[in-house]
């Protein structure tokens, strides 16, 4: 292992364990009807009770009438800005600070990310981002960092495609923080990342936004739950911070089932080029965005596996339409619409060489399959029959499949994971969610020759 002198470090101090982290401070301005007040502003990442970016304003000289009427809702703050950038949103709380002779407000932006540093013309050579609640992975390479007299292993994963390179890096505190997350839940910084052009040339804010948006869905698909790059900072050739984009982690800690085995990080390195090639296509970007969104919600088992069954099959049908109709033109839109749901699944899975048989890892489904029971022809038939019993109140089998809901939920998600991997041209190994397995135990995807 080589000693790592890498410049890649967090751009903000998330290590203190505080529930509110200062990201930026500057000049603030608010408008109460026709009156404009100037003061100081701060942008913070608040982690409790739920992670959010909030803006805080501290204003002197606010008239008593405006302060009172705003506090009781008779007047509204019509605009709030920091450094001349108006931030659309709404006031959460307000009130006087008698000791400081100030009127303070807390403002929630309408959407994230929030940007007041840099603009569309800003050029940068690298972007540093932060990952909260990612997985405890073994890197594709390893370095060391010193902490006091001790040397610690640092894990790195390198992703590359189409002239871009992305590095994911663990921290000295990663393993300890993941243990705390497993015990306490919540939000903790576990990894940082860096985006650069392979030739070290500059790129624009739009380039950075596009790459970060793709990484949001790629990394979330790898984890099996929302895990997006947040609080990105762009640096120019001199190392100056020229662009900042602040956002919050979407979900608190969860450790869902997923195809990605964290001890085999080469899996995501291998998938990345094919995924981003699909992502670069407008139609496929929209399809993957929808499908992965449904996948992530379906995979959150505590929200209900019956709902997860329905969401998963909506995602499979969407994937089948994009692949079978729009890309391969195997049939028309009308022809696709006229198919049974099970045939839409068969069309996709057969085309991608994903097996149709009900697997032995779902013994309760296998028990119900024979002709003297449900007479299910294959897994698509079983999955769609169970889904139909949930969504159609008049279904003759409604309420009769409770003992196989978990297997149907898990099998449907396995098919969805395999479909996404195959469509992205992946032919490596994966962790099979259908099997009880150790971390590090993987197998080849079914279509690998």
Residue ranges and their predicted role:
Residues 290-298, 386-393:
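Solvent-exposed, amphipathic alpha-helical segments
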Residues 2-293, 300-303, 403-446:
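Charged, non-catalytic interaction/linker regions at domain boundaries
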Residues 309, 369-435:
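Charge-enriched, short contiguous segments at helix-coil
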Residues 224-228, 321-329, 399, 429:
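Short, solvent-exposed secondary-structure capping/transition elements
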Residues 358-373:
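Conserved mid-sequence domains
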Residues 216-220, 317-320, 324, 395:
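Alpha-helical repeat scaffolds in large eukaryotic proteins
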Residues 291-359:
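Long, well-ordered mid-to-C-terminal structural blocks that present hydrophobic/aromatic surfaces
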Residues 283-288, 352-355, 380, 385-388:
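A glycine-rich, aromatic-flanked flexible loop/lid motif
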């Amino acid at each position: 292992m080589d000693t790592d002198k890498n410049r890649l470090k967090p751009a903000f101090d998330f290590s203190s364990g505080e529930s509110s982290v200062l990201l930026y401070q500057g000049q603030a301005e608010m408008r109460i009807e026709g009156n404009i007040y100037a003061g100081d502003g701060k942008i913070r990442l608040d982690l409790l009770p739920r992670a959010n970016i909030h803006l805080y304003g501290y204003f002197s000289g606010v008239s008593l009438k405006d302060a009172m009427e705003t506090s009781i809702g008779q007047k509204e703050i019509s605009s709030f800005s920091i450094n001349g950038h108006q931030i659309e949103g709404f006031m959460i709380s307000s009130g006087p600070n008698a000791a400081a002779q100030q009127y303070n407000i807390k403002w929630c932006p309408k959407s994230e990310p929030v940007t007041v540093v840099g603009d569309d013309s800003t050029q940068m050579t690298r972007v540093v981002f932060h990952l909260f609640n990612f997985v405890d992975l073994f890197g594709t390479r390893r370095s060391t960092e010193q902490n006091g007299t001790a040397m610690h292993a640092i894990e790195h994963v390198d992703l590359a495609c189409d002239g871009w390179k992305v590095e994911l890096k663990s921290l000295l505190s990663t393993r300890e923080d993941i243990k705390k997350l497993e015990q306490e839940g919540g939000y903790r910084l576990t990894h940082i990342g860096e985006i650069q052009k392979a030739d070290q040339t500059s790129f624009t804010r739009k380039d950075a936004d596009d790459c970060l948006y793709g990484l949001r869905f790629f990394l979330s698909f790898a984890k099996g739950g929302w895990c997006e790059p947040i609080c990105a900072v762009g640096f120019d050739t001199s190392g100056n911070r020229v662009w900042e984009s602040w956002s919050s982690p979407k979900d608190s800690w969860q450790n869902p089932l997923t195809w990605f085995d964290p001890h085999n990080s080469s899996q995501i390195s291998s998938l990345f080029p094919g995924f981003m090639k699909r992502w670069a296509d407008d139609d496929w970007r929209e399809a993957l965005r929808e499908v992965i969104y449904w996948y992530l919600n379906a995979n959150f088992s505590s929200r209900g596996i019956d709902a997860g069954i329905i969401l998963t099959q909506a995602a499979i049908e969407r994937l089948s339409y994009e692949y079978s109709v729009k890309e391969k033109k195997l049939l028309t839109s009308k022809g696709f619409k006229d198919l049974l749901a099970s045939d839409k699944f068969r069309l996709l899975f057969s085309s991608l060489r994903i097996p149709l048989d009900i697997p032995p890892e779902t013994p309760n489904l296998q028990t119900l399959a024979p002709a003297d029971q449900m007479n299910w022809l294959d897994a698509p038939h079983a999955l769609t029959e169970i889904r139909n019993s949930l969504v159609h109140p008049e279904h003759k089998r409604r309420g009769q499949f409770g003992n196989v809901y978990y297997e149907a939920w898990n099998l449907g998600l396995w098919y969805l994971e395999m479909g996404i991997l195959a469509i992205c041209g992946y032919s490596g190994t994966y962790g099979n969610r259908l099997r009880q397995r150790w971390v590090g135990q993987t197998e080849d995807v079914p279509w690998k020759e």
